[in-house]
Amino acid sequence: MGKAEVRAALGDPSVRLVNALTRKQHAGDGAHYGRPGRIPDSTCVPALMLVQRGTGMFQPLPELRAAVEAAGIKPGQRVITYCGGAIAAACDAFVLTLLGHDDVAIYDGSLAEWSNDLSLPMETG
């Protein structure tokens, strides 16, 4: 999915933007890509929280489901995942698909592209 499609999804309540970076990066603190922060109205489901430390295996299904539900992602909702460069976003997209979500896309350019385009909005905090 490209930048134009993500821009068109802004403000659309039928679409959920999901940032797979850390909560700190989501807030605009710590390491960032271009400008700090996130794409407006996105929620954060850190990819690192979806895997078990040490083994790299995914968390059990009930924990994955709880993380997705806590982020407000509803069944049947279109979801666009992103991160810094689409790697962590692929993890989130896989988990969403595993949990039965069938309308999931990855913003390939992610924040490496979005945050470097000064015409596009960013949020922090």
What feature does the model see in each segment?
Residues 1-16, 20-125:
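Rhodanese-like catalytic fold shared by cysteine-dependent sulfurtransferases
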